[in-house]
Amino acid sequence: LKMPEMLDAAIEGSIKAMWICGYDIAQSDPDVDHVVAALSNLEFLVVQEIFENETSSFAHVILPAASFLEKSGTFTNAERRMQVVQAAASPPGAAKTDLEIYGLISARLGHELPYEGPEDVMAEIADLTPHFAGVTFERLGRRGLQWPVAADGTDSPVLYETAFELPEGRAHFAALPYKPPGDEASEDYPLILVTGRRLEHYNVGTMTRRTGNLELFSSDWLEIHPEDAQELGIASGDVVEVRSKKGRIEIEAQVTERIEPGH
């Protein structure tokens, strides 16, 4: 199931429990009311996190997890480069790495996981995934390897030099059919909401709201074009209520020509 389908199933009652790891869905999902309805209807919710957050407020059990600085493993970036991450500190208090948590829960359920550490997980991935066949912690070293990695450890800094892995050797381009927006302006909702990003925060701020960045940008505001503001009697600094089919919010307005009329 996709996430919206999981939430629908929780509301309907066919999904009765969830285990959410490292994802503050009650903060980051665009339809928060939908999420709240789903989480509130669960019979059992486990949240595995490094901090308490909006999602953990619905949890029956919170499993304290280690941050990325407190656990070893690997990550792969958009350059196809796999790199080793080494823990710089031990997890505080009762916090444990994700692998330790999964191992302990699995053991209590009667199945011992065959991993003593992230090296064993990487070995299994290499055994099951041809593109990672030659990957080991030792070979990754300080600079990592770019997959595909042959069994002898040779990696692929350039993925395609002369042709693509297709019968004719050429890339495929496909035209996608037009899909109208999910919501359009109407008599009841005449304006279109455009959500954006702020330099000071990463995405919806589930991480950066816990840093000094909050002093640089502590709250959101609504930008509205002067034409729309005049029609609605709104001035910069006014606190306005914004309503949609999904929910409502009270927020400070800023009148600016940065935004187009009707948005």
Predicted regions and their residues:
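Non-catalytic alpha/beta scaffold blocks inside enzyme catalytic domains
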Residues: 1-134, 196-263
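Long, low-complexity segments enriched in small/aliphatic residues
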Residues: 118-212
